[in-house]
Amino acid sequence: MNVVQGNIESKNAKIAIVVSRFNSFVVESLLDGAVDTLKRFGQVADDNITVIKVPGAVELPLAARRVAASGKFDGIISLGAVIRGGTPHFDLVAGECNKGLAQVALEYDIPVSFGVLTTDTIEQAIERSGTKAGNKGGEAALGLLEMVNVLQALEEQL
């Protein structure tokens, strides 16, 4: 039996982090967690990490698509925070963002990690950006590092 899996060390990986500025008080903590994870666990060099900031979560897929189309990166981390309000806007933004990012991954055959919080309250978002519930930015980075290595291993074996 042949098992293909990836580890998290990716010293030479070139990683783009596409970040929504909306709800920046939460998203900046997600970014800190992602960068810390890339450096500490992935051993990714500063020069191999590019941060791209966009206005909001709806803009994440387009920026990720442009990054993927460049062919210069091994993976993309998307970070944002969509917090439910009193209108259906939350469902539209969260759904389109998720769908668009998944489409980029499939269209360009590049790992796109989803680190966009979709929470009911500000408190839940804060908890998931580095307090009680860990840092989902760091978790998104871990998943991305593993997928970069899985895809490289598949390329070598197939």
UniProtKB/Swiss-Prot annotation:
(2S)-2-hydroxy-3-oxobutyl phosphate binds at G86, T87, R128. GO terms for biological process: riboflavin biosynthetic process. GO terms for molecular function: 6,7-dimethyl-8-ribityllumazine synthase activity. InterPro entries: LS, LS/RS, LS/RS_sf. Keywords: Riboflavin biosynthesis, Transferase. The active site is at H89 (proton donor). Its EC number is 2.5.1.78. It catalyses: (2S)-2-hydroxy-3-oxobutyl phosphate + 5-amino-6-(D-ribitylamino)uracil = 6,7-dimethyl-8-(1-D-ribityl)lumazine + phosphate + 2 H2O + H(+). 5-amino-6-(D-ribitylamino)uracil binds at F22, A57, V58, E59, A81, V82, I83, F114. One of its GO terms (cellular component) is cytosol. Pathway: Cofactor biosynthesis; riboflavin biosynthesis; riboflavin from 2-hydroxy-3-oxobutyl phosphate and 5-amino-6-(D-ribitylamino)uracil: step 1/2. The keyword Transferase applies. The keyword Transferase applies. Catalyzes the formation of 6,7-dimethyl-8-ribityllumazine by condensation of 5-amino-6-(D-ribitylamino)uracil with 3,4-dihydroxy-2-butanone 4-phosphate. This is the penultimate step in the biosynthesis of riboflavin. Belongs to the DMRL synthase family. Forms an icosahedral capsid composed of 60 subunits, arranged as a dodecamer of pentamers. This is 6,7-dimethyl-8-ribityllumazine synthase.
